[in-house]
Amino acid sequence: MPPIKRSKPDGGVKKISITATDVTPAKGVEEKMSWKEYKKMKQHTGGGTRNKLKKKQRPPTENTEGRAKKPKVLTKEQLERHDTGADQIDPSSMRSKLQQEKMKVTKDKFQRRIEATAKAEKRLVENTGFVAPDEEDHSLTYSIRQKDIAESVDLAAATKHFELKLPRFGPYHIDYTDNGRHLVIGGRKGHLAALDWQTKHLHFEQSVMEKVSDVKFLHTENFIAVAQKNYTYVYDNLGTELHCLKTMYDTARLEFLPHHFLLVGSSRNSFLNYVDVSVGKQVASFATKSGTLDVMCQNPANAIIHTGHTNGTVSLWSPNSKEPLVKILTHLSAVKGIAVDDQGNYMATTGLDRKCRIWDVRMFRQLHAYSLPFGVSNVAISQKMNVACAVGNHVQVFRGMHNGTCKEPYLVHNCGGVVTDLRFVPWEDVLGIGHAGGFTSMLVPGAGDPNVDTLRSNPYETKSQRKEREIKQLLDKIQPELISLNPDDINKVNEGLLELEEEERKKILYIRPMAVQYTPRHKMRSKKSGWKMEARKNIVKDQIRMERNMEKHAVEKEVFEAPEVDDEAPKKKHILDRLK
């Protein structure tokens, strides 16, 4: 087919004329033409559709410097941030060559994982925001009110600022879930409510008709621990009472250790109680002998409990010791607030001496101290190291307290009532405030981590994902015996405990066994005589002695060397050997 001709007449309308040529032979088609013959004929007559022109190839890109680009090298700090001990693996310490090769493969796999994680971290392009005044305006940031911030941000962020005015039942204590999605509030006069604070969906609301000292979420939003007048109660997400923990009496503060499933309560009679909520068993309970324990927090890095006392000291507790692991003199007056960051590196304390002090938990040394105009009661630390302090009816938020660059407050908000509780929302730029007039959700730009770690806690998890996470948490549960100041101790072998168990086992060799005391049950209508009763006693005693002798024989084999055995197999005895 020849090309299409286009012509433009004087009227301005395009006209298209198409001409066709007949390629049939003049004599006609005598035989049936094959596909290959038809293809050759089409190419010969010029009507082929195949484009004989070669494809244009893209010219090779040449580097201006004349050499290939080198891959970006990761810095040592980026690799150390994600290193979990791969450099400490020594394949040469293995005995056999097969084990050495396996350990080399394992070490290479760990190193590749570290590099992949460090490279993926570069793709986290979300940055934290902050509040800054205009260049022409020389006003300070703490003069900006919450109303101005809510009008400047997007609609989704503006809805996160709200207030619940409940002056009849306050003051309130609050708590958020680990993923920051759900909120529970408890008033001193018995008001209790739980809700999804982002969608404002109310789970339940009721009055327990008793004084509420503190509230705490357990491993999911379906379980809520409430410290009431006498005992601690556990409710579900519908407000139904599930348990009454009478071992936690007169509790003032509550903390939950998610990796150990331990609910910790500090009572007004100086007792510290640990309860395993997965099995409902009390793990430890001891008197601290330090007065009322109304100031308490946990170190998320190692699950150590920090308590503040009226003599200005802060004590660090573990369920494995009835004495404090560390005792620090933090203030010259009573301690009113304690907070530890998520990494477990810094601790903030406040006291009646109008001081807010920042401590290095790793060295137990004070880094900085800041003077405030009034006595500070509560304190909280966000994921990005913003420190919030409750000063009477006001809440002051500071930036850079841990590195000494803080000179004035970052934000200030008047709550209209005495502040009793502060909680930063994980993964959000929001600070929850419980006060005498109700609850306030305060916007704090730059407080939360913008890159959500869904493996750690997912704010958008579904019901099936929540159930799966709950099962994984139970499978990965850490025993309370492993709680210590150094969280890396969980990767080591407890040689002292192993030696102690071995010594206890060896005592069976030289300690006199205790007399077996067994009294068979008396049957009223039994026809057995007295000697049969004694026979039953002897059978049970002989069985106990036999088990003990077998255990003693096994220990003797381990402790003492086994007798030498000849290499030659013993010959079978023949009946005529007696005649030799």
Curated annotation (Swiss-Prot):
Feature: compositional bias, Basic and acidic residues: 64-85, 98-108
Presence of the UniProt keyword Nucleus in the record: yes
Keywords: Nucleus, Repeat, rRNA processing, WD repeat
SUPFAM superfamilies for the chain: WD40 repeat-like
Stored InterPro entries: BING4_C_dom, WD40/YVTN_repeat-like_dom_sf, WD40_repeat_CS, WD40_repeat_dom_sf, WD40_rpt, WDR46/Utp7
Chief location bin: nucleus
Transmembrane helix among keywords: no
Biological process annotations from GO: maturation of SSU-rRNA from tricistronic rRNA transcript (SSU-rRNA, 5.8S rRNA, LSU-rRNA)
SMART domains: BING4CT (SM01033), WD40 (SM00320)
Renumbered ranges of WD repeats: 193-234, 235-272, 274-312, 315-354, 357-396, 399-436
Gene Ontology, cellular component aspect: nucleolus; small-subunit processome
Localization per Swiss-Prot or TrEMBL: Nucleus, Nucleolus
Traits of the deletion mutant: RNAi-mediated knockdown results in induction of glutathione S-transferase gst-4.
UniProt region (Disordered), positions on chain: 34-108
PANTHER family the record matches: WD REPEAT-CONTAINING PROTEIN 46, WD-REPEAT PROTEIN BING4
Subunit annotation: Part of the small subunit (SSU) processome.
Protein function: Scaffold component of the nucleolar structure. Part of the small subunit (SSU) processome, first precursor of the small eukaryotic ribosomal subunit. Required for 18S rRNA processing. Plays a role in negative regulation of detoxification genes by inhibiting protein levels of transcription factor skn-1, leading to down-regulation of skn-1 target genes.
Record protein name field: WD repeat-containing protein 46
